[in-house]
């Protein structure tokens, strides 16, 4: 009878009340139970008061109750009916997977950003290419225009073009000229030069030298002797004057061409010394009044010497542009 009464009394008690009675019989406090089970004191108190915290899953609550029962030596089988009532299994609320949606939105945003970046890059490359092509086309058109203008000017006025071998042709013409007229002129002009101081000479000397002998001596006198004239008389030309190379002008402009090149040269007076196309292996020797203004279509195809010194065209060659420069007396080219 006593056993059945005790069993009925235990069934009447709730799970929390049975755990509290067992704890008190063992002389344990709620703090001691919480420390042994590694729980909060509030959690132990809720279990003894048959409360189910809303923020605690039923699975964890059932586990805490079983651990509490083993601690106070209560069989788990006796607590199972009460556990179904105190901590029924509840379906866990699964939160929506926001991380996936956030990642998807971030990926979409990154895709738009990457597309915009590539678009800007393509636009910059396209603008750079268009600018380079327009600049190159403008240079080619400018060279063509200058070449057409020079051709028209050459057709209208051939005197503006300077021959390539002007100095050489002149020297050859002077060298091949017969020397007999020069000698005759020198002889005829020397006779007055020798007889000019005759009034100042002793009359006896005039009587000794007959006129015919004087003519013979004058004709036989070599050309260098004719330079010894009295004071105030101008020196007379000789046979060597026709074959002597003229002195080089210090302002001469010498150009050698390694390829076909369009060229225009203007001196300080505005006269065009040359305007036209020069062929490969050609050379040009120009003389005028400095400073010279030059326009060169292909700077890499020409070598210029001014006052015996080379002119530096490397800055035009590097940029592959039409060279516009001025050569002054100090040979300081300026664009």
Curated annotation (Swiss-Prot):
Biased composition (Polar residues): 148-164
Gene Ontology annotations for the cellular component aspect, listed alphabetically: plasma membrane
Ranges facing Periplasmic side: 133-335
Subcellular location: Cell inner membrane
Keyword terms: Cell inner membrane, Cell membrane, Cell shape, DNA-binding, Membrane, Signal-anchor, Transmembrane, Transmembrane helix
GO molecular function terms noted in the UniProt entry: DNA binding
Coiled coil region boundaries: none
SUPFAM superfamilies the record matches: lambda repressor-like DNA-binding domains
The protein's name: Cytoskeleton protein RodZ
Region described as Disordered: 148-244
GO biological-process terms attached to the record: regulation of cell shape
Major location (coarse): membrane
NCBIfam families: PRK10856.1 (NF008109)
Segments traversing the membrane: 112-132
Domain HTH cro/C1-type: 19-71
Gene encoding the protein: rodZ
InterPro entries, alphabetized: Bact_Cytoskel_RodZ, Cro/C1-type_HTH, Lambda_DNA-bd_dom_sf, RodZ, RodZ-like_C
Organism: Escherichia coli O1:K1 / APEC
Keyword rRNA-binding attributed: no
Listed Low complexity bias regions: 165-205, 217-239
Pfam families assigned: HTH_25 (PF13413), RodZ_C (PF13464)
Superkingdom, taxonomy of origin: Bacteria
Membrane topology: Single-pass type II membrane protein
Function summary: Cytoskeletal protein that is involved in cell-shape control through regulation of the length of the long axis.
Cystine crosslinks: none
Residue range(s) of DNA binding per entry: 30-49
Keyword Transmembrane helix tagged: yes
Family: Belongs to the RodZ family.
